Every structure is written in C-alpha cells, then in structure tokens.
Swiss-Prot record:
Pfam family, one: Ribosomal_S3Ae
Single GO biological process annotation from the record: translation
Major subcellular site: cytoplasm
Organism (species): Kluyveromyces lactis (strain ATCC 8585 / CBS 2359 / DSM 70799 / NBRC 1267 / NRRL Y-1140 / WM37) (Yeast)
Entry GO terms, CC: cytosolic small ribosomal subunit
Disulfide bonds: none
Modified residues (N-acetylalanine): 2
Keyword Cell inner membrane: no
Assembly mode: Component of the small ribosomal subunit. Mature ribosomes consist of a small (40S) and a large (60S) subunit. The 40S subunit contains about 33 different proteins and 1 molecule of RNA (18S). The 60S subunit contains about 49 different proteins and 3 molecules of RNA (25S, 5.8S and 5S).
Molecular function GO terms recorded: structural constituent of ribosome
Keywords: Acetylation, Cytoplasm, Ribonucleoprotein, Ribosomal protein
Protein name (Swiss-Prot/TrEMBL): Small ribosomal subunit protein eS1
Family: Belongs to the eukaryotic ribosomal protein eS1 family.
Amino acid sequence: MAVGKNKRLSKGKKGLKKRVVDPFTRKEWYDIKAPSTFENRNVGKTLVNKSVGLKNASDSLKGRVVEVCLADLQGSEDHSFRKVKLRVDEVQGKNLLTNFHGMDFTTDKLRSMVRKWQTLIEANVTVKTSDDYVLRIFAIAFTRKQANQVKRTSYAQSSHIRQIRKVISEILTREVQNSTLAQLTSKLIPEVINKEIENATKDIFPLQNVHIRKVKLLKQPKFDLGSLLSLHGEASAEEKGKKVAGFKDEILETV
C-alpha cells in the first residue's frame, strides 16, 4: 500500500486534543413564578442560552409552557393527581411571570376511577370567559347506588345520561361565562363546581367521583401586561399566594 494513501501515516503529530467547553457556561438560569392564585409561587428554574448579539434570551423564554403538579403549588398531597400547565408571558429580570394554560389528570387517577357495575358519564363544553379566554372543559362522573338499594349494579338509563350531561354542560357554561380566568382557577382548585354538579343531578341519578378532568386553552386575548402584573401582584415579589379554601371529600359506598 502506498504511504500517501494511508491516513494513519500521513496524519503525523497534527491531531491535538480539542479544548472541551462546558455548554452550561453559555446558559443562564431563570426563576419561574406562578400566579398569586396558587399558594406556592416558586415553581422552579429553567435554562436558556444567554443573550448574544441580536438574539435575546427573553424571546426564547416567552411562550414556554411548563407542567407542574398542583400538590407542589398548593402544598397539599390532596391535589397530587392533578397537573397544571403554566405559560411564560413576561420576563422581569431573572423572574418569569406565568399564566394559567391548562389542567389535566394523571393517567393512574383516571384508570383507578373506572370500575365495574357503574356508568361512566362524560361531557365537554367550549366556552369563553368574561376576559375573552376560550376554554374547552371536560367533565367526568360515575353513577353510584341509591339509598337503601339492594341491587348490586348502578347502571343509568340513556335518558338519565342525557339529562345529566345537559345539566353538567349548563353548569360549566354558566360558571365559565361569569368568571375571569383567575376566578375560574380559584374554583377549580377546591373543586367547587364538582359539588354543584353532584347536588344538581342527585334527583336524576346519584353520582360519585365528579371531576373537571381537563381544561384546555384554545384561544387567548391580546397580551395585556397590566392584567398579568395584577395577577402576580404589583411588585411580584411575594413568594406566597392566597390560600384557596378546600373541602374534604365525602366517603362514598364502594361498588
């Protein structure tokens, strides 16, 4: 073999080790702040590349969506099965001001609620809040035994399901239309709407495990910095938000 064709021989002593640069030296940390609707406002930290030339770090941060467990935001394990999405809307120094972007249930919680000998009822509505946020809200409910019932099953008839679904849709539409996004979030945390649905449908068929299982943000109004700052407090320096009063779930008879 010719020497000129052998890459190992022709390389010589040129191959020096390249200087290894830590990629984290080009990045910086930002603190994520939740709205004052939640009790704990410190969500966590996020990384972003430092501002270089015309490329600004804040442009990469705005619109970023983070998913947080509601138990961490409220400091209570009672909300461990619910996930909240927060969207970064504004950058103030090293703080990222977020707004509510959606809510969902964990998969294990949804699977654990489905049992035999009962009927699953689902309903969803697309409605606009009083401050022009368009939301799609999904509700879920399960039938339970009536008082002094001997029969093992608690299946609802199709007519009952239609009536219950209609009542759920009416309550969800009314509650959302008469509330701002912040007010609606305050209702979703202690599950006030769930109890209202359960009481409104008890004459049709008794229900259990009534939940708003998902809230999806479809459309948002034009960004208003003033409303965002008021949502976080004027100075946005408080580490604690206002506490939302909750309640204890009633112990229902298992089926």
